[in-house]
Regions:
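Hydrophobic alpha-helical
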Residues: 58, 71-72, 76-137
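Extracellular/periplasmic ligand-binding modules, especially the Venus flytrap/periplasmic-binding
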Residues: 104-112, 150-167
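Solvent-exposed loop/turn segments at secondary-structure junctions
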Residues: 3-6, 19, 45-49, 76-80, ...
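Structured segments of extracytoplasmic/periplasmic soluble domains
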Residues: 2-5, 28-32, 36, 61-65, ...
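Short, solvent-exposed amphipathic alpha-helices that sit
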Residues: 21-25, 49-68, 82, 86, ...
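Hinge/cleft segment of the Venus flytrap/periplasmic-binding protein
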Residues: 42, 46-50, 61, 157-183
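Flexible loop/hinge segments that line or gate small-molecule binding clefts
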Residues: 1-20, 31, 38, 131-139, ...
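Structural recognition of the beta-strand scaffold that forms the well-ordered cores
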Residues: 1, 12-13, 38-43, 71-73, ...
Length: 183
């Protein structure tokens, strides 16, 4: 499998450790804010394993800081339009938010749109996937970070192992090959 949790009989899983990526992103954002601040979390679709694992990692990472408060955690379904509308609604209630961590880049980019429209340009926004739009937003300074999940690299490695297995029946040493990407 590529990117999703592997079943017991899976030959190989390549991709990012979603829990670890959520944890790493949360720590990076919390450290940037000096270990204190109010956070909004934009969750992924209910039941999506990558969204659940990222969210668990985010919550664990942020819980390590006494000065961090998660003021809201709500789904944006990995959609830019929902990221924007959810953020618009939440910033009316939480006008002093310091950061938004979205469980994917599309939701994060929607949050950026909402925050820009509200002239809240100092709010840190983080996402996941390393999309072109999010990478450009980081370069432009409208997003703090995106976590590159490298789907091309994951697919390439999975195919290389499959070809090797078909050619000489060599199995990988483990069932999961994580990609060391960075926030």
């Amino acid at each position: 499998t590529i990117g999703t949790p592997a079943a017991e009989d899976t030959f190989l899983r390549t991709g990012v450790d979603y829990y670890e990526s959520g944890y790493t992103m949360a720590k990076a954002a919390a450290d940037k804010l000096g270990g204190k601040g109010k956070f909004i979390i934009l969750e992924g679709p209910a039941g999506a394993s990558n969204a659940i694992e990222r969210l668990n990692g985010i919550n664990t990472g942020l819980s390590e800081y006494e000065g961090i408060e998660i003021v809201a955690s709500q789904t944006a379904n990995f959609k830019r339009t929902e990221g924007m509308s959810v953020t618009e609604n939440l910033i009316q209630q939480y006008t002093d938010v310091d950061a938004v961590i979205a469980c994917n880049d599309e939701s994060a980019l929607g949050a950026v749109q909402a925050l820009t429209a509200a002239n809240m340009n100092d709010v840190l926004v983080c996402g996941f996937d390393g999309s072109v739009d999010a990478t450009n937003a980081v370069k432009e300074g409208t997003m703090f970070a995106t976590y590159n999940t490298d789907p091309y690299g994951s697919g390439f490695v999975a195919c290389a192992y499959a070809v090797k297995y078909l050619n000489d029946k060599t199995e990988p040493e483990g069932k999961f090959i994580p990609f060391p990407t960075a926030a």
